[in-house]
UniProtKB/Swiss-Prot annotation:
Keyword entries, A-Z: Aspartyl protease, Disulfide bond, Glycoprotein, Hydrolase, Protease, Repeat, Secreted, Signal, Zymogen
Enzyme class: hydrolase
Organism: Arabidopsis thaliana
Disulfide bonds: C118-C124, C283-C287, C322-C413, C347-C385, C353-C382, C427-C464
Lineage: Eukaryota, Viridiplantae, Streptophyta, Embryophyta, Tracheophyta
Chain positions carrying an annotated carbohydrate: N399
Keyword Glycoprotein: yes
GO MF terms held by the record: aspartic-type endopeptidase activity
Family assignment from sequence similarity: Belongs to the peptidase A1 family.
Residue ranges of every copy of the Saposin B-type domain listed in the record: 317-419
Gene: APA3
Name of the protein in question: Aspartic proteinase A3
Propeptide feature: residues: 26-69
EC number of the protein: 3.4.23.-
């Protein structure tokens, strides 16, 4: 009786938590393969799980580890909170085919799915698992694999089998059978695994990505793939990924292309960012950005995210160190900036930072809100000072008075974001929030409040959060912007592997 009840309970839980839907695929006369994407509706349970994941992760994670690759024991991919991902598609593996729902992720490069040998991770019991013994095309590999995700890791081993994406069959594709998955992130996820579309340079175990094999084996017409993400919440169609080309009906005008500057990620250079038409000045000399389909969020340096938070009224951390810097050193900093001093060196010149040529604001806002030792306090004061210098410089370019500049900097001290977390906003103010503009390839790309604000529920029960999150990446990799679905939704995105470039056009 007990066994029957446990079996019934397991089936019931599976039915409640697994997303059951189908994704269409189509081979067209133009030689392209189109994969229909499913879109997960935003809900409070996943948003809560996302917050718990970030809270549990926070004390163990440091931005300086974000881009560490090829560790002697494990590889590192961009740290993601995949619970924020909204778009998925289906693939099959093996003969006969076994279906899996995956995120098509341009921010990583491996294909991994749960293994039937995943016994001890609860997450595996709530997702489809690959059964090697039931596939006649399976080829044993056995090479161990581990991908670290902050506080946990996906671990397992490599196997080889036929992978079908749409109508394309990639023979003997190497992929990871995950035998261990970290806690809540993958337990509540509406997908089974990840299909990475990044470059081989960041592939765990130097495994050849699925996309590379598509191109090298001549399975696609052109070495291009493109994303259209449907942002209409009332439309059942979630979007589409096209392998081998683009779908003209999903964009307007011409794409603006920029070259990939660092292979591994789809990374490129961008210009300055504007808030309500006002330049921030932070990226006036250029910043790096990554087009990342594996996240719904848009992540950038704390300095600029704080300015956005202030403009949209987002809640943040009140930083005592930041306020102390503005109060004690604000006028001195302004005098240095008026004397045309480099904002990055102002804080060392007034003695707040020990500038050694590498210190910069990108060391992170984590230190700004730390308490404890004098070393942490000094670092917090330095980071706060460097951010304030950028804010003041931005206001000086707008010919603001010294009194207004100091008041503005003090106000921003109340809106510093929590590292890598979203901020709550007033749903009633969304229509009056500013347009945020990115400069890419000499062209302006606007994001409206409807693009960057997530709304859950209706009426008095509604909750709104900003899609902008802060994460500081130290030089030489940073400062860095990660443009997720918030950006790729309004802008159709082309990933041109053949010419090493990324293109954006207004989505239709």
């Amino acid at each position: 009786m007990g066994t029957r009840f446990q079996s019934f309970l397991l089936v019931f839980l599976l039915s409640c938590l697994i997303l059951i839907s189908t994704a269409s695929c189509e081979r067209n006369g133009d030689g392209t393969i189109r994969i229909g994407l499913k879109k997960r509706k935003l809900d409070r349970s996943n948003r809560l799980a996302s917050q718990l994941f970030l809270k549990n992760r926070g004390s163990h994670w440091s931005p300086k580890h974000y881009f560490r690759l090829n560790d002697e024991n494990a590889d590192m991919v961009p740290l993601k909170n995949y619970l924020d991902a909204q778009y998925y598609g289906d693939i099959t593996i093996g003969t006969p085919p076994q279906k899996f729902t995956v995120i098509f992720d341009t921010g990583s490069s491996n294909l991994w799915i749960p293994s039937t040998k995943c016994y001890l991770s609860v997450a595996c019991y709530f997702h489809s698992k690959y059964k090697a013994s039931q596939s006649s095309s399976y080829r044993k590999n056995g090479k161990p694999a581990s991908i670290r995700y902050g506080t946990g890791a996906i671990s397992g081993y490599f196997s080889n089998d036929d992978v079908k994406v749409g109508d394309i069959v990639v023979k003997e594709q190497e992929f990871i059978e995950a035998t261990s998955e970290p806690g809540i992130t993958f337990l509540l996820a509406k997908f089974d695994g990840i299909l990475g579309l990044g470059f081989k340079e960041i592939s765990v175990g130097n495994s050849t990505p699925v996309w590379y094999n598509m191109v090298e084996k001549g399975l696609v017409k052109e070495p291009i793939f493109s994303f259209w993400l449907n942002r209409n919440p009332k439309d059942p169609e979630g979007g589409e990924i096209v392998f081998g080309g683009v779908d003209p009906k999903h964009f307007k005008g011409e794409h603006t292309f920029v070259p990939v500057t660092h292979k591994g990620y789809w990374q490129f250079d961008m210009g300055d960012l504007q808030i309500a038409g006002k330049p921030t000045g932070y990226c006036a000399k250029g910043c790096s950005a990554i087009a990342d389909s594996g996240t719904s969020l848009l992540t950038g340096p704390s300095t600029v995210i704080t300015m956005i938070n202030h403009a949209i009224g987002a809640q943040g951390i009140v930083s005592r160190e930041c306020k102390a810097v503005v109060d004690q050193y604000g006028k001195t900093m302004l005098n240095s900036l008026l004397a045309q001093e480099d904002p990055k060196k102002v804080c060392s010149q007034i003695g707040v930072c020990a500038y050694d040529g590498t210190q910069s604001v990108s060391m992170g806002i984590q230190s700004v809100v730390d308490d404890g030792t004098s070393g942490l306090l000094n670092q917090a004061m330095c980071s706060a000072c460097e951010m304030a210098a950028v804010w003041m410089e931005s206001e000086l370019t707008q010919n603001q008075t010294q009194e207004r500049i100091l008041a503005y900097a003090a106000e921003l001290c109340d809106h510093i974001p929590t590292q890598n977390q979203q901020s709550a906003v007033d749903c009633g103010r969304v229509s009056s929030m500013p347009i945020v503009t990115f400069s890419i390839g000499g062209r302006s790309f606007d994001l409206t409040p409807q693009d960057y604000i997530f709304k859950i529920g209706e009426g008095v029960e509604s909750q709104c959060t900003s899609g902008f999150t802060a994460m500081d990446i130290a030089p030489p990799r940073g400062p860095l912007w990660i443009l997720g679905d918030i950006f790729m939704g309004p802008y159709h995105t082309v990933f041109d592997y053949g010419k090493g470039r990324v293109g954006f056009a207004k989505a239709a």
